[in-house]
């Protein structure tokens, strides 16, 4: 039997032991990987998602404390979920939407509203509902992207909403202090959503990234989850944006 006190390398107490993590958008991809990582660090997890069947499958897989199926972009549903939380919450992870390719001359008003609400308004309403629920020193972790730093056709509105997130998160960190607020800005992540968007072009995209990225591999959901849990654990981190793109921004063009 290993004596923990005799060899610190042989034993490490889980860093989130006894804590509760809410993952909004926790049924697949980055969300379920974050839940899995949090569980490995000793946390209880509460998962939310739109699709009740996928949510239940994810909950069974990771051993979630509870689930709630609702659309987080609906303020009333989000408020009901928050009011129903009897367990003190330590951390909230919001996975956020995927990219939407909407040319500005073709997008309608409701699509434009959605592009903004899926980023800024979702973060605002999560922050407001977290007040009084998340403990001091706990954290809200939001997902954004690095794509806004390199303009592209069809992404003007989504890029604008994404680009606003770092400033919003920094301000929210001041408004909600001592609750911490941070942002993860991801490049391409090899998720089921990415696969559905790229279809038959997925393998070519993966190969292109493997050969061009400085890290010589594709960023996966587990990589993002590891960063999210690190942000939860390190209680000095707040108001900041953390890029995770494998060096994608360093590639010319």
Spans of features found by a protein language model:
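Short C-terminal tail/terminal secondary-structure segment
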Residues: 2-11, 238-253
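Conserved glycine-rich cofactor-binding loop
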Residues: 27-28
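Rossmann-fold cofactor-recognition segment
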Residues: 61-76
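Substrate-binding pocket helix/loop in short-chain dehydrogenase/reductase
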Residues: 103-104, 110-116, 205, 209
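Catalytic loop of short-chain dehydrogenase/reductase
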Residues: 115-116, 124-126, 139-177, 188-189
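Conserved Rossmann-fold SDR core element
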Residues: 166, 175-190, 237-244
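A glycine/serine/threonine-rich, flexible loop-to-helix segment
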Residues: 189-212, 253
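C-terminal substrate-recognition "lid" of short-chain dehydrogenase/reductases
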Residues: 217-244, 249
């Amino acid at each position: 039997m290993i004596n923990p006190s005799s060899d610190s390398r042989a034993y490490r107490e889980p860093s989130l032991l006894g804590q509760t993590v809410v993952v909004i958008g926790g049924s697949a991809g980055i969300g379920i990987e974050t839940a899995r990582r949090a569980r490995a660090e000793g946390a209880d997890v509460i998962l939310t998602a739109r699709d009740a069947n996928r949510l239940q499958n994810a909950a069974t897989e990771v051993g979630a404390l509870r689930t709630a199926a609702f659309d987080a972009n609906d303020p009333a549903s989000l408020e009901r979920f928050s009011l129903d939380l009897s367990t003190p919450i330590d951390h909230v992870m919001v996975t956020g939407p995927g990219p939407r390719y909407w040319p500005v001359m073709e997008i309608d008003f409701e699509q434009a509203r959605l592009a903004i609400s899926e980023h800024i308004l979702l973060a605002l309403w999560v922050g407001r509902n977290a007040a009084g629920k998340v403990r001091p020193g706990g954290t809200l972790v939001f997902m954004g992207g690095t794509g806004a730093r390199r303009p592209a056709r069809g992404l003007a509105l989504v890029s604008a909403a994404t680009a606003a997130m770092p400033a919003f998160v920094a301000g929210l960190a001041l408004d909600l202090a001592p609750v911490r607020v941070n942002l993860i800005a991801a490049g391409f992540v090899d998720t089921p959503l990415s696969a559905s968007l790229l279809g038959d072009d997925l393998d070519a995209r993966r190969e292109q990234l493997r050969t061009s990225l400085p890290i010589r591999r594709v960023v996966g959901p587990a990589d993002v989850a590891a960063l999210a849990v690190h942000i939860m654990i390190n209680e000095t981190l707040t108001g900041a944006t953390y890029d995770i793109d494998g060096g994608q921004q360093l590639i010319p063009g």
